[in-house]
Amino acid sequence: MNNPKTAIQRQFNRSAAGSYDIHADVQRTMAAELAKSIIERNSRGKATEPKILEIGCGTGQFTELLLNQWPHVSITALDLAPAMIHTAEQRFKSRQSANIRFLQADVEIWAVEAPSDSFDLIVSNACFQWLSHPRQTISHLKRFLREGGSLVFTTFGPNTFLELHQAFAEVYHAYGMEPQRHGLSVLSTNQWEEVLAEAGFSTIYCQQDTQKETYASPRDFLRSIKSMGASHSEAIPIDGLSPRKLFNEMYKVYEEKFNMKDGIVATYEWLLIYAG
């Protein structure tokens, strides 16, 4: 059986060369809101230059926002994909003052043995939806935090790509089949609050937002997702409905139900979560 993390790593390695930054408009919005929240909260705290762990640094977009605020801050920036780490390193090659340690690792494995009380702030932008074991991983992250430290992150919510899921479901029902989820199953705000409380966080704040994006067609929408490395699916092939037929039928339903003047619409639901 294929390891899902290996497939995810391969997808993001392919997108690191440039296609990710071109297509990641929603992730940029999430990063800007995350940075704004962190800066506002930190300005009221004690640590003006916190020691930071960034999980899922990608090409370094969010890392750059942190450095623009704190030029001499100490950051450990971790990512699963080696090509993403390489791209991020190149982004900061000319910033000699930057105190960044880049680390290629799966956070869910790395976190098991990483030292306690190591960071003032743990941040992550548009990454935690990829966690296979969020409860265990969040528990480890809580252990990393020094007294008074916090975990602040954005992630995608369950209503992300709701049009796509509805279109697929209609096709499955038309063939008398149980719908499968094409994409990730992600946690809701209530589920995240439960996970964080179980890990020992006492102050938890969740903010939800929805962003609508338009694409020329369902095919263009899926190409954009693939260009960002986010084409992983939990669905498996079914006898009697080939992938080609399934997708062609889905395209028809999508265009019929979610057509707009400029193409088709796709919903992104994202969550901004603070835990301290």
Swiss-Prot record:
Molecular-function annotations in GO: carboxyl-O-methyltransferase activity; malonyl-CoA methyltransferase activity
Biological or metabolic pathway of the protein: Cofactor biosynthesis; biotin biosynthesis
Pfam families, A to Z: Methyltransf_23
InterPro entries, per the entry: BioC (IPR011814), SAM-dependent_MTases_sf (IPR029063)
Keywords annotated in UniProt: Biotin biosynthesis, Methyltransferase, S-adenosyl-L-methionine, Transferase
Transmembrane segments: none
Signal peptide, first to last residue: none
NCBIfam families: BioC
Record family assignment: Belongs to the methyltransferase superfamily.
Annotated function: Converts the free carboxyl group of a malonyl-thioester to its methyl ester by transfer of a methyl group from S-adenosyl-L-methionine (SAM). It allows to synthesize pimeloyl-ACP via the fatty acid synthetic pathway.
Alphabetical list of Gene3D superfamilies matching this protein: Vaccinia Virus protein VP39
UniProt-listed CDD domains: AdoMet_MTases
GO-annotated biological processes: biotin biosynthetic process; methylation
EC number from the UniProt entry: 2.1.1.197
Protein name, as recorded: Malonyl-[acyl-carrier protein] O-methyltransferase
Catalyzed reaction equations: malonyl-[ACP] + S-adenosyl-L-methionine = malonyl-[ACP] methyl ester + S-adenosyl-L-homocysteine
Zinc listed as a keyword: no
